[in-house]
């Protein structure tokens, strides 16, 4: 069975999302082991690194063929770090009750929508009605996974949720940005 270019492209994107989740796991483990939780120059760098990794591996490839691609790729990684921070801050400090699934669904959907808009505007990519619909649905489902706690001894808390959210958002970006 021969893969079409679109199928191959999606497989590469999903593989990059898996690498992003693996690097998330590594950052969490190293942060806990070496107590890298302190701020450097006002930044909680392990915290921001998680968003940067997703942006660099999942969002930045959309800017690969554009003019000023390096600047756009860096901008997408930075946007991802900011989106990650906004989602976490909303979940922890927002107006909704932290103990319900609603906060996770809302934060996940909002972060996914912002991710799609960032790619469409910064990469840039042609905007379609499918992008906000797909990212909102993917983000909501991925966000709901954060309400489901799995006590794996070998994995940091919520690894399954990051895996679900990142893969679903990766798929939503791929399908939502197609013409």
What role is predicted for each listed range?
Residues 2-179:
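Juxtamembrane/disordered regions of integral membrane proteins
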